[in-house]
A protein has these predicted regions:
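A conserved structural motif in NAD(P)-dependent oxidoreductases
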Residues: 35-46, 57
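Catalytic "switch" loops of ABC-type ATPases
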Residues: 14, 56-57
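Short C-terminal tail/terminal secondary-structure segment
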Residues: 51, 62-77
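Residue-level preference for short helical/loop micro-motifs built around acidic side chains
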Residues: 19-20, 29, 44, 60
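Short, flexible catalytic-loop segment of classical short-chain dehydrogenase/reductase
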Residues: 9-20
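Rossmann-like NAD(H)/NADP(H) cofactor-binding core
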Residues: 1, 6, 64
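Alpha-helical segments that scaffold the active site and NAD(P)H-binding pocket
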Residues: 10, 51-55
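A short C-terminal helix-loop "cap" of Rossmann-like NAD(P)-dependent dehydrogenase/epimerase domains
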Residues: 21-35
């Protein structure tokens, strides 16, 4: 009882592992073609959704997946 199960589904965010790729022209073209917002996400853009799910503001949410992906999922439909 009282257990909530939610998730954040991040899109493309620059990390140490992928930064070399996203610095290339091919990587930049890929992001512009796949992400309607035309850019990579910034890590601090995950803060709001994370705080929502971790706080009482999200106390009536369960079974929810929050996409933080610049519209990538909707663009692929």
């Amino acid at each position: 009882n009282g257990i909530r199960v939610n998730a954040i589904a991040p899109g493309y965010f620059r990390t140490e592992m992928n930064s070399d790729y996203f610095d290339t022209e091919h990587g930049q073209t890929y992001v512009r073609s796949k992400v309607p917002m035309g850019r990579l996400g910034q890590l601090d853009e995950l803060d709001g959704p994370l705080l929502l799910l971790a706080s009482e503001a999200g106390s009536f949410m369960t079974g929810t997946i929050i996409n933080v992906d610049g519209g990538h999922v909707n663009n692929s439909l």
